[in-house]
Amino acid sequence: MKYLNNVSYKDCVGKVCKSKSSGDFKVLKYNDARNVEIQFLKTGFETVTQLGNIRNGNVKDPYSPSVYGIGVLGNKHPITINGVLTREYKLWTSMLVRCYSDNFKKRQPTYEGCEVSDKFKSYEYFYEWCHKQVGFDNDGNGNPFHLDKDLLIKGNKIYSESTCVFIPSEINLLLTKSTASRGQHLIGVYWHNTNKAFVA
């Protein structure tokens, strides 16, 4: 059998090996065949794996861009709970799809040129940012607010912590459908800096 990395327990320590999808990694310590410590060279992430996985290159770095070649999952927060995708993960991947999926932009050309900020490319950062925002969980009646990038800055093309807010679905629908001329925000709506909320 041909291995991606031809190493044995006798000579693996110190070797730089290749993974199938996360770049090169170095073997730091061999404890036994099921407990081998490694470190990915690009990100510095350390983990424990099996010797067989090292030979086959079947090890993954959660800090290597893996979602649309740009999103970094990290290792701190779940993407599913009891087999169900988390709201944070669905929001994050939906944002990446809108900006980096060619197929999506063919169907929705208004998203052409949209980007995600460097911080929002990290699921860990986005997850924690969401939990600090008013309206992330719900509007008080159990209805989730929508993530929006257009209300604070007219014509905005960047999803970031300084341009995104959670807004009621009704306002989001008006923003989507309205073609009327307006100011910086929706007609009759302004952002109250002190209260960190929208006022109509």
Task: Please describe what each predicted stretch is.
Residues 38, 77-101, 106-197:
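Short, cationic Gly/His-enriched loop motifs
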Residues 53-55, 179-180:
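Short cysteine/histidine-rich zinc-coordinating motifs and their immediately flanking basic loops
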Residues 31-54, 190-200:
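Short, surface-exposed polybasic/aromatic micro-patch for ligand or macromolecular engagement
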Residues 54-62:
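Short amphipathic alpha-helical linker/capping segments at the junctions of internal repeats
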